[in-house]
């Protein structure tokens, strides 16, 4: 086992894992890992998860880190992961309540910013079918999600022909002009 390519902090992690009896040598012999990925790997091995069939060769370091998090949280990553998926999209799949629903939108070609809004729809407990339309951009989706969180009916707002500013204006107007603006200013960071 050659540890020369690892920095001091990474070497310390590896030696600590070896002293604890974790089988880390067989994984680091195959591939070089970053410090963060080593942390995830050691955590997963400490939790007694089996990584014998884990495809380390198919994924890059960032992707492996998110897949190890999925293994740790017992998320079935084999249903949604593929080597072409960006690591920041994988991060959403690890923590989303319904990965199959997010996968549906990912396969339809939604970009990261739109997927992030869909992810928030799902985790807030709303049905993302409200914006099941490729004509919506992420700003329109964000305003519709804010309306749903404010318990407003979105029939009039879920119109791809409206700009996000028009949707925001209708949303504030639905709260009542005075109350809507006060609510918007006080709760901007929560919406």
Predicted segments with their positions:
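General marker for long, soluble alpha-helical cores
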Residues: 1-191
């Amino acid at each position: 086992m050659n540890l020369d390519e690892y920095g001091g902090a990474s070497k310390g992690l590896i030696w600590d894992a070896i002293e604890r009896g974790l089988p880390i040598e067989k994984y680091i012999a195959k591939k070089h890992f970053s410090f963060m990925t080593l942390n995830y790997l050691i955590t997963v091995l400490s939790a007694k998860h089996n990584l014998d069939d884990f495809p380390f060769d198919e994924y890059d370091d960032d992707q492996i880190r998110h897949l190890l998090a999925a293994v740790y949280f017992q998320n079935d990553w084999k249903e949604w992961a593929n080597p072409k998926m960006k690591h920041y999209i994988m991060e959403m799949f690890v923590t989303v309540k319904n990965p199959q629903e997010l996968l549906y939108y990912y396969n339809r070609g939604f970009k990261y910013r739109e997927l992030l809004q869909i992810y928030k729809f799902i985790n807030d407990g709303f049905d993302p079918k409200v914006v099941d339309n490729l004509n919506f951009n992420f700003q329109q989706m964000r305003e519709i999600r804010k309306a749903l969180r404010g318990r407003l009916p979105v029939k009039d707002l879920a119109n791809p022909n409206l700009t996000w500013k028009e949707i925001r204006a209708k949303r504030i107007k639905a709260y009542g002009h005075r109350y809507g603006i006060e609510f918007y200013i006080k709760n901007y960071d929560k919406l």
